[in-house]
Structure formats: structure tokens, C-alpha cells
């Protein structure tokens, strides 16, 4: 395969390539297509799937397998041509075969390529680091979280229902005096103040006592999921059976022994202080990284093809699909449950996809300007980390992850570390 011509078009980041595919490569592709398609071809005098290639070509023409063989060749041919031209293709707009014969074929491709962006003033970026001071209030907040996790619900008889209680109720709803589907339940546990029910529903239970029967009036939101109930006023008959409130444990040495391996409250607070300190440090470091990333994206100059955002969003959807499959789920079921289509799912990742693309391009620009190189030692170290993380043999990792791809990733990581090292942290 060889690049015959590479012409830059008027549109930004657009090129037209003319590529030649040699006879040997094309012939191998034709043979692959023949072996795949012969299984479904019926030729008189031969068992199905057993007709020789030259017989099929004589009956249907010598070019019978050419179209599919060219399709088979396009990906590798474009990859090699782009490599020779020193460009990275992000999308193929058009493909046009020029001529084909047993000596090979030529084609033209209109492509969009990854831009070579500009960036300046990236060394000495100023960022502000969040406070990592551990106060007594923060430690107390952690203790309250643990108390909440170890709480229990107890029946309350001596007061009216209030927010954060669980009300055990029967309810039945009516619109224009008629009961509607899904509007009735018995012994339903409703946490008051949760906002899980129609606006105004929970608020009207607050103040009532166990054993009371009463009626409340609410209005369904205009965007309610059930079309027939949108914007409608409804009455609900309520029977309040029970009020349950959260009972929190006392904070003392016995509580500490129940929830940790410490013996005293002071020891437990000291441990929590260390935990909070680490969390605050991690959060502060992550926030610094985010600030640096945002500044780099702001400094980026150049026009980014929409295809790059689109490709990244598609990749994120594929990653999400793999996570679902690892949990025994599938994308179709998930979308049905969430009430969304493929475009809506992809749209969820649009903003994050744009950030990833911009940051990557910014760091690639930094790497170019700083002449960052990746050594064999760098690659070996990265392969070693990956092998350890995935519990795989290093040689298997090297086969799965091409050195060319890993080199780009390591180069980008080096660029990011350089910018972080030179950042001014206040």
C-alpha cells in the first residue's frame, strides 16, 4: 500500500488522500472474501459452498468479489496512508474507488484529521489549594454519619409526624372523583421530607398523629410521567397507621467499641481525624488537578473537529456498556428503564467528552513544544504497572497494548506532570 497524494482542503482539518493498494494485498483480500462468501453460493454441479473461486468468477464476472475486498482493505490502507502523511484521521467523510484489477486498486478518501493545536503560557499556572485543616466540627460530622448508619427506627406515639419521620400509611387517590391506576397502596412506608412523592403530599402528612384519617389535595406536575395526570388536581384519602422516628445511639466508649476497633472515644476521634485529613488532602489535590486542567483548556488555540467530540462520546458509551455487561445488565434494558434512546444516552457524555478531547489536545501541544520524549525505560515501567494492575504477564500486556498507543499516553502524562510541577499553588 502506498500514499499517492495528500491534499489539504479549504475546510479546517480536512484532507483528500489518494491511495494505491498493491496487487498482493488486494488479492489476499479477494481470497478472504471468497472464503467467507462461498459458503452461501450455489453453483450447478458443485455442492453448496464448494465451488472453486475461478468457477464463480467465470459465472459472475472476475470482479464479483472486488467491492467487498476493497471494503476489507480500506481500514489498513487509510491507517498506513495517514501514517505516511503524518496525520491522524478522526473521521472519513467519503470513500471513492478509482479503479480495480488483479494488479490492485486505487481510491480517494476525504478525511477529517486531528488538529495540531497551539498553546502558550502553560508554565507557571496559578491555582488555589483548598484548606486541609481538620477542625473539631469536621470530626463531629463524621461521628454523626456513623451514628446515623447505626440508628434504628422506633415507633412514636406521643407526638405528631414531622420531617425525617417514616409514616406508615394507606392512601388512595382520586381525580375528578375517580380512582386512577397506581394511586393506591396499603402500609406504605413514606419518609417525610424525602421529596419522593408529588409536591405537597408529604408536607400535608406532617402534623398529623397516629390513627388519624384525613384527606389531602395536591396537583400533579405539568411534566409528570403519566400523561393523563399531568397538571391535574387530585385528592388522596390517608390513613396514618404508625409514625416511626430514627433513634440515634449515645456517643460514648461503648458506642466506639461497637463501631470500631478502638476502646475509647478519644482514640476513635484521633483515628477519624487522620481519616478526614487524608480525605481533605485527596480532595484538595484533585481540585488542584481540575483547576490546572481547566486553565489548560482555556489556553488551547485552534479549531477542533466535531467528529473528535463525537468519537469520544461514542467511546464513553462503549465503556459504559462494558460496565453494564460486567454487572449482568445490557444497554437496551438500561435505556428502557431510564426512558431514553441512544441519542439521549450519548448526550449524557457530551460535556465530559468535550473536556477529555480538549485536555488531551492541550497536553499533546505541550508535549510538542517541550520536545517531550518517551524512552524504552518509560514504556517498560508503564507496561509493568499495567501487568501488576491487571494481574497479567507483561508479554501479554504488550501484545494487547501497542507500543505506539502507549507512547502517546505516556507522553501526555509527562506533559501533565510537567505543568503540575511548574504550577504556582497558593
Regions found by a protein language model. Give the residues of each.
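Acidic/polar surface patches and capping/hinge elements
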Residues: 127-151
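Extended, domain-scale alpha-helical bundle/helix-rich regions
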Residues: 65, 71-117
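Residue-level marker of beta-strand positions
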Residues: 104, 110, 166, 213-215, ...
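Short beta-strand elements
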Residues: 46, 88-96, 184, 329, ...
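Short, conserved beta-turn/loop elements at beta-strand boundaries and strand-helix junctions
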Residues: 100, 114-116, 176, 243-248
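Phosphate-interacting basic helix/loop segments used at nucleotide- and nucleic-acid interfaces
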Residues: 88-96, 145-165, 347
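Core FKBP-type peptidyl-prolyl cis-trans isomerase
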Residues: 29, 33, 143, 154-208, ...
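Extended, charged alpha-helical "arm"/coiled-coil substrate-binding scaffolds
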Residues: 1-70, 80, 139, 172-174, ...
Amino acid at each position: 500500500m502506498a500514499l499517492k497524494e495528500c491534499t489539504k482542503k479549504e475546510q479546517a482539518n480536512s484532507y483528500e488522500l489518494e491511495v494505491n493498494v498493491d496487487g498482493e494485498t488486494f488479492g489476499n483480500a479477494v481470497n478472504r472474501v471468497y472464503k467467507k462468501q462461498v459458503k452461501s453460493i450455489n453453483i450447478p454441479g458443485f455442492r453448496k459452498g464448494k465451488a472453486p473461486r475461478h468457477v464463480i468468477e467465470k459465472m459472475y464476472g472476475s470482479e464479483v468479489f472486488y467491492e467487498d475486498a476493497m471494503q476489507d482493505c480500506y481500514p489498513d490502507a487509510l491507517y498506513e496512508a495517514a501514517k505516511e502523511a503524518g496525520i491522524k484521521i478522526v473521521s472519513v467523510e467519503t470513500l471513492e474507488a478509482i479503479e480495480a484489477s488483479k494488479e490492485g486498486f486505487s481510491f480517494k478518501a476525504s478525511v477529517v484529521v486531528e488538529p495540531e493545536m497551539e498553546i502558550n503560557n502553560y508554565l507557571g499556572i496559578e491555582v488555589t489549594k483548598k484548606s486541609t485543616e481538620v477542625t473539631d466540627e469536621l470530626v463531629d460530622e463524621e461521628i454523626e454519619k456513623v451514628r446515623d448508619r447505626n440508628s434504628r427506627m422506633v415507633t412514636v406515639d406521643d407526638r405528631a409526624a414531622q420531617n425525617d419521620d417514616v409514616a406508615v400509611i394507606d392512601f388512595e387517590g382520586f381525580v375528578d372523583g375517580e380512582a386512577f391506576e397506581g394511586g393506591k397502596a396499603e402500609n406504605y412506608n413514606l419518609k417525610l421530607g424525602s421529596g419522593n412523592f408529588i409536591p405537597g403530599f408529604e408536607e400535608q402528612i406532617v402534623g398529623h398523629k397516629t390513627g388519624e384519617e384525613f384527606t389531602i389535595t395536591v396537583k400533579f406536575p405539568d411534566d409528570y410521567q403519566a400523561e393523563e395526570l399531568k397538571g391535574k388536581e387530585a385528592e388522596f384519602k390517608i390513613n396514618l397507621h404508625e409514625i416511626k422516628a430514627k433513634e440515634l445511639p449515645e456517643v460514648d466508649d461503648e458506642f466506639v467499641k461497637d463501631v470500631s476497633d478502638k476502646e475509647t472515644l478519644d482514640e476513635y476521634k484521633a483515628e477519624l481525624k487522620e481519616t478526614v485529613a487524608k480525605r481533605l488532602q485527596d480532595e484538595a489535590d484533585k481540585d488542584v488537578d481540575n483547576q490546572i486542567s481547566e486553565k489548560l483548556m482555556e489556553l488551547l488555540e485552534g479549531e477542533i473537529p466535531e467528529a473528535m467530540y463525537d468519537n469520544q462520546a461514542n467511546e464513553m458509551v462503549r465503556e459504559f456498556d462494558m460496565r453494564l455487561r460486567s454487572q449482568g445488565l445490557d444497554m437496551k434494558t438500561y435505556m428502557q428503564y431510564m426512558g431514553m434512546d441512544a441519542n439521549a444516552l450519548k448526550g449524557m457524555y457530551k460535556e465530559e467528552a468535550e473536556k477529555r478531547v480538549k485536555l488531551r489536545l492541550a497536553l499533546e501541544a505541550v508535549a510538542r513544544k517541550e520536545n517531550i520524549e518517551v524512552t524504552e525505560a518509560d514504556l517498560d515501567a508503564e507496561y509493568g504497572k499495567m501487568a501488576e494492575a491487571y494481574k497479567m504477564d507483561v508479554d501479554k500486556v504488550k501484545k494487547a497494548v501497542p507500543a505506539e498507543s502507549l507512547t502517546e499516553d505516556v507522553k501526555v502524562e509527562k506533559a501533565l506532570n510537567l505543568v503540575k510541577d511548574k504550577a504556582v499553588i497558593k
